[in-house]
């Protein structure tokens, strides 16, 4: 018996909720200075209900070999990764038109 998606009610093999969620998000990438003048890359605009933030953060931390965290609606990575993070997010399935660098 097929597993049913809780969001749309379709079987998981036909479900497109994850793709629709990635298309409708507006992602903002910016540099943030935290305590002791440490810089980090803040990725905001990710919906925690539609995207698994822990998995996104894990992929990004492995790619950039840095520490980071996933909280409600944002992912924070230690260090300045603004120059390459857009290409990585496109590789994870987010549309390039919805990603904005600040």
Swiss-Prot record:
The keyword Lyase does not apply. Disulfide bonds: none annotated. Keywords: Protein biosynthesis, Translation regulation. GO terms for biological process: formation of translation preinitiation complex; regulation of translation; translation reinitiation. It comes from the Archaea. It holds the Pfam family SUI1. SUPFAM superfamilies: eIF1-like. The keyword Protein biosynthesis applies. GO terms for molecular function: mRNA binding; translation initiation factor activity. Belongs to the SUI1 family. This is Protein translation factor SUI1 homolog. It comes from Cenarchaeum symbiosum (strain A). The lineage of its organism: Archaea, Nitrososphaerota, Candidatus Cenarchaeales, Candidatus Cenarchaeaceae, Candidatus Cenarchaeum.
């Amino acid at each position: 018996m097929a597993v049913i998606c809780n969001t749309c009610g379709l079987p998981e093999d036909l479900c497109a909720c994850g793709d629709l969620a990635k298309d409708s998000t507006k992602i903002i990438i910016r540099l943030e200075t935290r305590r002791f003048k440490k810089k980090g890359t803040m990725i905001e605009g990710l919906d925690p209900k539609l995207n698994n933030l822990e998995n996104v953060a894990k992929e990004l931390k492995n790619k950039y070999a840095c520490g980071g965290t996933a909280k409600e609606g944002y992912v924070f990575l230690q260090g300045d990764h603004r120059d390459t993070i857009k290409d990585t997010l496109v590789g994870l399935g987010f549309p390039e038109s919805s990603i904005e660098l600040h």
